[in-house]
Amino acid sequence: PSALNAYLDCRLRFYYRYVAGLKTPDEVSAEIDSALFGTIFHLSAQLAYTDLTATGKTIQKEDLERLLRNDVKLQSYVDQAFKKELFKVSPEEKPEYNGIQLINSKVIVSYLKQLLRNDLQYTPFEMVAMEKKVSEEITIQTGQGPFTLRLGGTIDRMDAKESTLRIVDYKTGGSPKIPANIEQLFTPCLLYTSPSPRD
């Protein structure tokens, strides 16, 4: 989860954002950093799967194959995400991409195709949720008494096949983080194993 990563990276930034509720101001920039790249990819995937599940929750092999052949449709999902997340314009507007933005757009389309090809191997499956916010309160006994905190995050996607619920966490780049200690490997698992992730 992003909040946990923010805490591990910089506790003061975590406090300002998640405890005090302060947000960093939106910057108007032509640049696409890795966080924005990931956000655009996430929204593109969500738009694609929202369309795929418009008539039912089950994703069939034929649906994915048809979408994989439709480059115009895939580009339209990415364009919609760019309009919302980078350009901050209405869906009807047609912003002009600069060279770097155009390259990033094509890379995101290729990532989206790879996601669809990966999911093709898993079909048929049922879409359970996308971009689902989860949180759990945990009470820890300390020397000063019990201390309660809330851990939370957003699950990119949950889908199901037969009796298996799959949690999908999209990764679009960056170098793999090496945990400083063994505890960091298991903390996020607490959220994913809580008793009610599938409302």
Enumerate the predicted regions with their spans.
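Short loop/turn segments at secondary-structure transitions that flank enzyme active sites
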Residues: 13, 22, 47, 51, ...
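Active-site metal-binding core of divalent-cation-utilizing nuclease and nuclease-like domains
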Residues: 128-161
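C-terminal, charged and often intrinsically disordered regions of DNA end-processing helicases
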Residues: 1-49
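A non-catalytic, helix-rich entry segment at domain boundaries
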Residues: 44-133, 137-138
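A structural signal for short, well-ordered beta-strand segments and their strand-loop junctions
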Residues: 6, 129, 167-169
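Conserved small/polar residues in nucleotide/adenosyl-binding loops
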Residues: 192-199
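Glycine- and acidic
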Residues: 1-3, 19-31, 53, 59-64, ...
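Conserved catalytic cores of phosphodiester-cleaving nucleases, focusing on short active-site segments
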Residues: 10, 41, 151-176, 194
